[in-house]
Amino acid sequence: MSNTEKNLPTKYDHMSVEEGLYQWWLEGKYFEATGDEKKQPYTIVIPPPNVTGKLHLGHAWDTTLQDILTRTKRMQGYDVLWLPGMDHAGIATQAKVEGKLREEGISRYDLGREKFLEKAWEWKEEYASHIRQQWGKVGLGLDYSRERFTLDKGLSDAVNKVFVQLYEKGLIYRGEYIINWDPATRTALSDIEVIHKEVQGAFYHMNYPLTDGSGHIRLATTRPETMLGDTAVAVHPEDDRYKHLIGKTVTLPIVGREIPIIADEYVEKDFGTGVVKITPAHDPNDFEVGNRHDLPRILVMNEDGSMNEKAGKYNGMDRFECRKALVKDLQEAGVLVEIEPHMHSVGHSERSGAVVEPYLSTQWFVKMAPLAEKAIELQQKEEEKVTFVPDRFENTYLRWMENIHDWCISRQLWWGHRIPAWYHKETGEVYVGTEAPADIENWNQDNDVLDTWFSSALWPFSTLGWPNEDAADFKRYYSTDALVTGYDIIFFWVSRMIFQGLEFTGERPFKDVLIHGLVRDEQGRKMSKSLGNGIDPMDVIEKYGADAMRFFLSTGSAPGQDLRFSMEKVESTWNFINKIWNASRFVLMNMDDMKYEEIDLTGEKSVADKWILTRLNETIESVTRNMDKYEFGEAGRSLYNFIWDDFCDWYIEMAKLPLYGEDEAAKKTTRSILAYVLDQTMRLLHPFMPFVTEKIWQHLPHEGESITVAAWPTVREDLQDTEAAAEMHLLVDIIRSVRNIRAEVNTPMSKKVQMQIKAKDEAVLAQLTKNSSYIERFCNPSELTIQTDLQAPEKAMTAIVTGAELFLPLADLINLDEERARLEKELEKFDKEVERVQKKLSNQGFVAKAPAAVIEGERAKEQDYLEKREAVRQRLADLEK
């Protein structure tokens, strides 16, 4: 793509910059892992998006962070594999496909399983294509030659092998348990598929009569329809109010069934009446109580949420219709004594919106305790553990693992990995295997499929060729280096990948887990359809470009924190890119057809040259260090400050002196430094803004085909000059102070004014004298005086900088009262700074723990502030004379 054009287009247009570049990168195969044994591998597997539709801002954020990591590592010389892929997303995709069929007046049952699955695969192909297009728009450097899908044959083989091995170890079993049931889609749900909403409900207070006629016992419920399945009433064993009733029975109202009063510590004595109804088939806690007391389980609902024959006269009613009818009957019977309004959290299906029913069902489960134990033990091994960033999320993860429940893995769906279990038609024998039974005609396969998270848990190694442990990619690229994901799926995905990785590969699936938060709107609200505050990343890209969106997303929050999305801030980033574009145009217009090999940094350098090269070194160090710590925000801010302030606002302006001067050697050195600094800066910025940096870099003198594979900048000690940097800081302080004073008294820079500088000592005097051309160029004095023994002139505006005092005699413009007030404000500022730094230095904890260089830096600040404060005091005293 080598550019023959000398200059960039006059205006920055993100659409024309980004157009065609991604395809050019793909054709160059810059994103494909090479397997080069001389290079260290670096692997990330993308968290697979669901093939259900568009990617949202959360995906854009998540994948941008991964792209930053992989682009950086590629430039640092690693053999990078960033493996793309997508998730079949069982219930989500099936719901979408069924919805589409309903529009045609068809149900999945009309089609049958095989035909329905054909429709689901058609959906997958269509939406997988959309997702790839969106990845391209964001600019993601993915290795498409290794793209995977959770229902690919290789991944399906891995799923079956894992299921069979866990079953053979006794870690997968089939049993009756309470699960989250969606009556609308008629399937079990994982906890993450249940959305809890605050809804207005009620406590229904009822009197259950004691069977012996001696009275009644009062209790309350929010789900009266489940009382039809009650098999006990429970009290706390230490509750003196009810001890005499333990062992007695009550008669279940309406139903007439006699049920026992039992004692169980599950009951909270101080909550309500201290009495709870126990419905083992319709509540997870009641299920556990029922197991402890060997209570029967009476299921009173059908899978569609209607009442069944066990509900007696309510048989066939919808559960909520039953509630109304039952409440009416209870009132008429005198059993219902109060309906108390009550706001409470109710689970809803993420997919259908239906109220989720705790429901007794025969399902397949993974026995979690032995698997979790290994994962917990891993975190005690410093060299082998998974590192969470930020580290506070490790405790979140461990707490969940320590209190883990068995995992329900079966789903009543058609789209997904069908459970590899068969039941003998005559004997009922269960066969579990990776292959179907030889006499298949005598067996029926389990109709259910596995929870989507079951296959997702194998993603880091199934995508690399496992269970073939000799697969080249598995041997080279596993375990992976980093996982980037949101804190909302630590439990449901991260934890499961860790214990499955340990169980089947013997090692952690990834070294680091970088946790980010959620994307929220400017008011801090979660983006949702109901609020109408969602933003399509493709719309952001169309308006401001991928580079602007990426830079905002990656620098807008710290690790682990939520991100407040602001279109205004994306626009500000676009303005930043526009500034880079204009600065690059200036550099390119002054290259004079310079070739890459002609860049020469050995010539004599000005203080500005030495300073910008030193600042570049500092920026390279800061960006690299922060990238290694996943502090993308800090890295981005370092780049922003260097580019905007140091390079654009100061160095480019100072470079105009030699560029427009007569000294040819100085011109050549300045051109070389401009080319070198812009080249290195574009490389540092490339992971954040891949499109515009490639475009600019292609116009610069360069070697190599693409910036994507250009070497990452490293600190060059031969270009480090801290003394020159200090000199430049003094010049910048002087120029900035003069500009501020002129602004205060409305004196334009074009108007020449007298300027006097009192140097602190001979060394400062020598510096300022040597660099006086910069002061004359940027301060525009009619006369410049620099001495060590100057007396402050009357009616002069004053500024105090490190090592010098500035005086601008503006007799006609100065107001002594205003100048006095200004200096008093300065004095107050230095008083606070002195107090702050002295408080820090008097803190024994700080002095004991901080590195010597940091303490020395604070002492230098203290001395500087003391000197500046004294100079301000002296100037105030002079004004009083």
Swiss-Prot record:
Q: Where in the cell is it found?
A: Cytoplasm
Asked if the Swiss-Prot or TrEMBL record annotates the protein with the keyword Transferase, the reply is no
- Where do we find the motif 'HIGH' region here? 49-59
User: Catalyzes what?
Assistant: tRNA(Val) + L-valine + ATP = L-valyl-tRNA(Val) + AMP + diphosphate
Gene3D superfamilies tied to this protein: HUPs (3.40.50.620), Isoleucyl-tRNA Synthetase, Domain 1 (1.10.730.10), Valyl-tRNA synthetase, C-terminal domain (1.10.287.380), Valyl/Leucyl/Isoleucyl-tRNA synthetase, editing domain (3.90.740.10)
Keywords, sorted A to Z: Aminoacyl-tRNA synthetase, ATP-binding, Coiled coil, Cytoplasm, Ligase, Nucleotide-binding, Protein biosynthesis
Q: What's a GO cellular component annotated to this UniProt protein? A: cytosol
User: GO molecular-function annotation terms?
Assistant: aminoacyl-tRNA deacylase activity; ATP binding; valine-tRNA ligase activity
Family, per entry: Belongs to the class-I aminoacyl-tRNA synthetase family. ValS type 1 subfamily.
Tell me which PANTHER family the record gives. Answer: VALINE--TRNA LIGASE, CHLOROPLASTIC_MITOCHONDRIAL 2, VALYL-TRNA SYNTHETASES
| Stated name of the protein | Valine--tRNA ligase
Q: Species name for this entry?
A: Bacillus anthracis
